[in-house]
A protein has these predicted regions:
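Bulky hydrophobic segments
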Residues: 2, 7-185, 194, 201-256
Length: 256
């Protein structure tokens, strides 16, 4: 009884330390639950028709659709709690499309072209997420240069794409899957890997330029001119500060 009471109290204190989940807009919430429902139906349908791996895949996919919620609950005071909800929406749509549409076409039809939009969008999504993460980690008081942000986001996206190919290679070797469309003695699997990386990198490059131009106000919606003015004002401040430091260095040199 003492052990149960102690366990209950520990659980209570842990729950009190968890953050509250921020309120969501109705559009995000509906999109998330539609994606989860489709994944659940797809997984159960696959299991009933002999595709047990699809049910396992759907289970893990549904868990990943709750990433934002887990960030909010367990993130404490770290930057991860500041990730915007629309990133989870993009991820959920991608996961749902990749599983329900992509996997179904790959396992039940001879159509193999679904990998092309999947990998392009994966690269775009990874690069866009890297832009958001770089801004959050840097903080509002220390704005990051757009060129540095672009290079970081591209490198981050390519790293994610390479990590996914490691995953595909491992699953094929351990469980006999054909995620890379080839077995060890043949070169077709290597070709598929390289094509996937090139497609994903293409999507990441597109996101790198689009997000950079959007953040400096070259393209965008109604707030484009405001962003452009803020960016130019920031550049002017940086230039002014550099000139001030240069003048101080020259003065100190003359004194010496």
């Amino acid at each position: 009884m003492y052990f149960l009471n102690r366990t209950f109290l520990k659980g209570y204190y842990i729950m009190k330390k968890l953050n509250r989940i921020k309120p969501l807009s109705r559009g995000h919430e509906i999109t998330w639950w539609v994606c989860r429902a489709l994944l659940f139906i797809w997984g159960v349908w696959g299991m009933l028709h002999g595709y047990t791996s699809e049910f396992v895949q759907a289970t893990f996919a549904i868990i990943f659709t709750h990433l934002w919620d887990m960030f909010q609950l367990f993130g404490g005071r770290s930057f991860i709690t500041k990730v915007p909800a629309y990133m989870q929406t993009l991820l959920n749509v991608f996961i749902c499309f990749g599983c329900v549409v992509g996997t179904t076409l790959n396992t039940r039809t001879d159509f193999t072209g679904i990998d092309i939009p999947e990998h392009i969008f994966a690269g775009y999504l990874a690069c866009t997420g890297a832009y958001v993460l770089s801004e959050i980690m840097q903080g509002e008081k220390q704005p990051i240069k757009i060129s540095v942000q672009a290079l970081f986001s591209l490198g981050f996206a390519v790293s994610i794409l390479v990590g996914w190919e490691y995953y595909e290679f491992t699953m094929d070797r351990l469980y006999g899957f054909t995620m890379q469309h080839g077995q060890a003695p043949y070169s077709h699997g290597l070709t598929d890997t390289m094509v996937d990386l090139m497609l994903g990198t293409g999507g990441a490059l597109a996101a790198m330029f689009i997000e950079a131009f959007r953040r400096v106000g070259i393209i965008g919606g109604k707030d484009r001119h405001e962003k452009r003015a803020a960016y130019l004002a920031q550049r002017a401040e940086v230039k002014k500060e550099k000139m001030r430091l240069k003048a101080l260095e020259e003065q100190s040199g003359e004194i010496k």
